[in-house]
Amino acid sequence: MWAGILEILSAFIRILFKLLYCWALFFTVLKGFSRGPLLPLIYLINKSL
């Protein structure tokens, strides 16, 4: 029983870290290119997710 709970928890944590990484990347891109060509970048990010 505990093994299953631990597996679910580790999978959840992995997904959470992936989401946090995506958000950090997104905000870094937004800060870096706030005066640059934003629309193509947002399009590429949406396509890659």
Swiss-Prot record:
The chain crosses the membrane at residues 5-27. Its main location: membrane. It is a single-pass membrane protein. Keywords: Membrane, Transmembrane, Transmembrane helix. It is found in: Membrane. GO terms for cellular component: membrane. It comes from the Eukaryota. This is Uncharacterized protein YMR013C-A.
